Amino acid sequence: MLTRLFSEPGLLSDVPKFASWGDGDDDEPRSDKGDAPPQPPPAPGSGAPGPARATKPVSLRGEEVPEPTLAEVKEEGELGGEEEEEEEEEEGLDEAEGERPKKRGPKKRKMTKARLERSKLRRQKANARERNRMHDLNAALDNLRKVVPCYSKTQKLSKIETLRLAKNYIWALSEILRSGKRPDLVSYVQTLCKGLSQPTTNLVAGCLQLNSRNFLTEQGADGAGRFHGSGGPFAMHPYPYPCSRLAGDQCQAAGGLGGGAAHALRTHGYCAAYETLYAAAGGGGASPDYNSSEYEGPLSPPLCLNGNFSLKQDSSPDHEKSYHYSMHYSALPGSRPAGHGLVFGSSAVRGGVHSENLLSYDMHLHHDRGPMYEELNAFFHN
């Protein structure tokens, strides 16, 4: 059919010849992409479109194809331009976001009257919860202060001190239950006052009727203290005190700090010549008059002044008398046994008995005295 159409002379008269196409290519300049050689025209009847610079596209039947109008071209250009602008705007936004950090958090909304009311109500509820919580905490701490072994009408323990003391108290009670033994008073107070401040330590010691100066807590002790908890009757004074009058061989034979049966008030042993007198008096090497529990009590280390031992104590108006025990009571005929009178008499003092064995009458502080000390005081003065 195609051969039949092209064989008709009426149809081929309007179609330009192929030779004229080849001649026209040499005269016209090449396009910008003219590196590629010109394409030959398609074979007749193939249906492929010709080159773009063809004069008029012709259909197979010889009809002209209508060219696109100007409006259509403008619409296509506008659509393409809008797409390019959108891409450029997106790229610009990405670059701007990369340069400055993004704003985080919720966006601020406009505060309305209803929102203000809700916010105020929430704040009031939160304040009420916090107030009730603090009231409950204070009530619980007050109940805890009534249980711990520290009471004062004028001073109130702080919250942290109350909790620390309660922790130490629980620990001390658990140790008592574990060992099954009654603890020493000094070690018990040291356990209670571990990590506490000095005012709280003084309160605890006062409640337990113990002088706070007689034990060293962690704040003031660097390792060595006057008290070591337990270890015999001489645990209070584990070290000897140097004195020129104690350097004799006669007193050194007595055994240093004395035997285990000696009382805690005796910080060293007697001379060998007088140990037999105490043994004969029934004390077993210890003074018979100092084996009573009434003389129990904490003492500070004695001072060695001019060969004499004297106990350190606070001066008070009621205890200004510093006269010596043996010199004041040696004249009483029935106050001491015969053996004791031999040792503490004035002749014995002149004979060389060391005055460190003769304790001061006012050996206890005023606030450490109880009814038993008042009875002793009345006994000595009658």
Curated annotation (Swiss-Prot):
Pfam families: HLH (PF00010), Neuro_bHLH (PF12533). It is found in: Nucleus. Residues 1-129 are annotated as: Disordered. A motif (Nuclear localization signal) lies at residues 107-113. GO terms for cellular component: nucleus. The keyword Hydrolase does not apply. Residues 121-173 form the bHLH domain. The C-terminal region is necessary for depolarization-induced and calcium-dependent transcription activation. PANTHER family: BASIC HELIX-LOOP-HELIX PROTEIN NEUROGENIN-RELATED, NEUROGENIC DIFFERENTIATION FACTOR 2. This is Neurogenic differentiation factor 2. It comes from Rattus norvegicus (Rat). The gene is Neurod2.
